[in-house]
Amino acid sequence: GLKAGTPVVAGAGDKAAGATGMGIVTPGAVSATIGTSGVVFAATDRPALDAQGRLHTFCHALPGRWHVMGVTQAAGLSLRWFRDRFGAGAEDGRDPYERLTSDAARVPPGADGLLWAPYLMGERTPHLDPNARGALIGLTASHTRDHIIRSILEGVAFSLRDSFTLFEEMGVPVKSIRLGGGGARSALWRQIQADVYGHEVEIVEVEEGAAYGAAILAGVGAKMWNSVDAACSAAVRVAQRVAPRPAVVRQMNASYAAYRRMYPAVRSICSKMEP
């Protein structure tokens, strides 16, 4: 067994640990991470409950704190789906996702009117609907492969923005937004998120937030710091900030309004096709 006196420290669930590793521990601090799924996670000092089940509320990794989060089922999965079905372009030694986002960067914000609904696996936020379906709307003969890729990047960001819309509805404050996951490695996707959210976004130095968060919690338990707040202030550092572009924010607001009309329209069509 363990030697007598060895500290044993409780950790946290994956999202709470990841948020701790990004410094998302005080009210107003929010993270938006894009992996296979996408998660918008807000730290709170009270349980913020959504009676409709569109957001999920849990205890945080530190006493007296909670977190509320929204989930996009197919965030990074949308881009992976495109890669797997249609390819990532000619091999040139770069990562396939770098090639895809580089292609998308050739297209202006708004993808010339093309919209993507990323509901490839049903959805959780804001539509708690296992039968939600994905859609590409606005396609014309002038659109290219690059337009489709950009519309996917923007559509995922619109889906994550839905969580921020619900936070506002519920009175959950948003003072800072930190990006994480594989999506945060793309300069284009970082800028798209800043423009879609209409808010400066930050990138922290350490990418592996969950492991880093578990290490921070262990350090607090071992008395390296006297609190998780103090530990995050000392150990979590911002590497980059990305500002939204006002003209693009206005354009993204208009696109988001159109995006919000997609789900009910597609749901109405698809419900009539179900056996």
Annotated model-derived regions:
Residues 1-2, 12-29:
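Conserved phosphate-binding catalytic cores of ATP/NTP-utilizing and phosphoryl-transfer enzymes
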Residues 4-9, 201-204:
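Short pre-catalytic strand/loop immediately N-terminal to key active-site residues, enriched for Gly-Thr
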Residues 10-13, 98:
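A short, flexible low-complexity segment enriched in Lys/Arg and Gly/Pro that occurs
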Residues 17-20, 38-42, 116:
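Short beta-strand scaffold segments in enzyme catalytic cores
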Residues 32:
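Conserved active-site beta-strand element of glycosyltransferases/polysaccharide synthases
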Residues 42-275:
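Glycine/Thr-rich phosphate-binding loops that ligate phosphate moieties of nucleotide
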